[in-house]
Amino acid sequence: MKPVFLSSIFASLVVASIAAASEPAPERQKELVRMVRQDCGSCHGMTLNGGLGPALTVEALKERDIPKESLVATIVGGRPGTPMPPWHRFLSESEADWIVDRLIEGFPQQ
């Protein structure tokens, strides 16, 4: 095999393994959905339509046009001086990223 071909295969495997590592395991995904529905829902509304905290629906997020990285940082680090707590003790940054992806595409019911 040619070195360029082998390099391409290796690069593809590395990218695939990084993508797989950032996706939580199916059981953890269920835990994260429950966490968002119950814990985040206590401020953002049980249907994420808003309450003490702003709405987290697809429409609301599009309207506010907040960069994804900012949403992840808010989940992980909270917002000092507001009721939004940091969640870094309960989830990783990659899990927060997964949550934001789900919010942007429409959060699952279960």
Where are the model-predicted features located?
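Electrostatic cytochrome c docking/interface patches
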Residues: 16-35, 110
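Sequence/structural segment immediately N-terminal to covalent heme-attachment motifs in c-type
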Residues: 26-49, 62, 70-77
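Charged, solvent-exposed alpha-helical segments that act as regulatory interaction surfaces
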Residues: 49, 108-109
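Positively charged n-region of N-terminal signal peptides that target proteins for export
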Residues: 1-4
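Extracytoplasmic electron-transfer domains, predominantly the class I c-type cytochrome c fold
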Residues: 58-108
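Short cysteine/histidine-rich zinc-coordinating motifs and their immediately flanking basic loops
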Residues: 52-57
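Bacterial N-terminal signal peptides
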Residues: 7-16
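Short amphipathic alpha-helical "recognition" segments used for binding
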Residues: 6-7, 35
